[in-house]
């Protein structure tokens, strides 16, 4: 079995993007001719001529020379065809080695035993090339996540755990003193400490806060929920996310364990004191 490719170097570099896949005429797969088919045909012809001309009306020497002439002609034609095939194969190999695929013909003779497997690989490659231009949807994303062995499944958060996270009304920081104009009390003492440290670290930064879930700017007076990683979001945006994922959308930090770990650290510090 032999594969014939007719194309240019630009087709290979562009990944056959110029309509190569729909046109199957560019890739031709056909069976190779038997090696001894022409020799058998000429041999049968010689035998027929010998049987027809083998009569007493013609001298034996003439028949012998006629048979030898036909045999030599058949051998010459067969050698010429073989030389043409070898020359074409050598030219294709030279063009492949030099990287010049400008309308050249490359013939690869494949044994019939692996022809079926090679055809299956070509069909798989054609399918992969066809999927390159397709857009991925949510189903493809979930499939890739399921195939990822390093992706550890995260548990969702309950309503009690979500309500335990601190919330407050968003207030713009005063640029002169760097402190907030007004601020609601947090739900726990550890949350207040972490929020105070977060507000102190925000001095000199931009006052605008953007919710990474809805990608909208947080305005003054909106309810903002703070995660243990100190990332802030709209309460209405982050709550549905936490019910499904239980992690921060920005840094993937587990939100259901952050405040508990911080409380344990504070308790250990108070016990040591």
Curated annotation (Swiss-Prot):
Ubiquitous. Disruption phenotype: Longer primary root and NaCl and ABA insensitivity. Keywords: Endoplasmic reticulum, Membrane, Metal-binding, Transferase, Transmembrane, Transmembrane helix, Ubl conjugation pathway, Zinc, Zinc-finger. GO terms for biological process: positive regulation of abscisic acid-activated signaling pathway; protein ubiquitination; response to abscisic acid; response to salt stress; response to water deprivation; ubiquitin-dependent protein catabolic process. It holds the Pfam family zf-RING_2. Its EC number is 2.3.2.27. Residues 55-56 are lumenal. It is found in: Endoplasmic reticulum membrane. Induction: Up-regulated by salt and drought stress, but not by abscisic acid. The up-regulation is stronger and earlier when the roots are colonized by the endophytic fungus P.indica. The keyword Transferase applies. A zinc finger (RING-type) spans 211-252. It is a multi-pass membrane protein. PROSITE patterns: ZF_RING_2. GO terms for cellular component: endoplasmic reticulum membrane; intracellular membrane-bounded organelle. It is an enzyme of class 2 (transferase). InterPro entries: Znf_RING, Znf_RING/FYVE/PHD. Its main location: endoplasmic reticulum. This is E3 ubiquitin-protein ligase SDIR1. It comes from Arabidopsis thaliana. The lineage of its organism: Eukaryota, Viridiplantae, Streptophyta, Embryophyta, Tracheophyta.
